[in-house]
Amino acid sequence: MGSIHLSPLSDLALELARAGALRDFVETGTYVGGALGWAARAFERVWTVEINPEFQRQAKANNPAAANVSYLLGDSASELPKIMGELKGPALFWLDAHAGAGYFADHDICPLVAELETVLASPFEHCILVDDARAFLAPPPPPFDYRKWPSLDQIFAAVANRPGYNIVAIADVLIIVPDRHRHLVAQFCFAIRPKI
């Protein structure tokens, strides 16, 4: 599991934010708000979507000082279009709304393709980080229902609908950025990957 708010991934996120003038942060899958304090300090505006009311309650309790955070309760595939209408420029997206097999949800939920299609339909050049890449690089094992999770080719097809984007899988994260930021991702990969 990646942690957007911890180094080295947070370093990449902040470098992308600087290079791309990303003032806004959008998270799907709030859980209990572990990344919200970091995001509230690093970005002007923050949106977070959580489907579980108890997790959202805990996230709010864990981040009482985060005044620039907007909390949305519901399915990210339905809530994300509302956020897209609020954006005035490119944003950093942390997509982590997938769950299942009794982990964070009773049944498998994986809105990733719908999320990608929504974000990439925007006229802005957003940067996207997707947590838990291992669940997409190969079918998730039982007790997950792999049929509810997109295959890697489905993810690539969603990204390919928006020409000019690059996708990399490293450190359990899918990194999807405009080609002009590819060098930043390459430097991140060079720094953290094992030698070949």
What positions do the PLM features span?
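A short alpha-helical cap/connector motif
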Residues: 1-92, 98-196
